Amino acid sequence: MNPYKIDFTDFFTSAFSVDCLIFGYKEGKINTLLIKRSVDPYKDRWAIPGDLVYPDEDLPVAAERILRELTGLTNIPMHQAHTFGSPLRHPQGRVITIAYF
């Protein structure tokens, strides 16, 4: 029973994603790892490695999986940096993104 009489289905319509910011240092300059997107939206554009989190997946596990699948990198220490949650930031609907670095 729902004592608040709220339709909770409205609250379960968002997706979650993880972006992995990976920095490198070469020839005195800091570099950021980018990938070329292979799917829409934004196919063939440069992006920070990121993807959706599976419904049954913990966030740190998702970050490791996404970085491995998109770049081949493994065993990279990462920490949560920031969460982006503006409702209009993604063309396909509300996506809450957790950034790792």
Show the residue positions of the predicted features.
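Active-site-adjacent beta-strand/loop module that shapes the phosphate/pyrophosphate-binding cleft
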Residues: 88-101
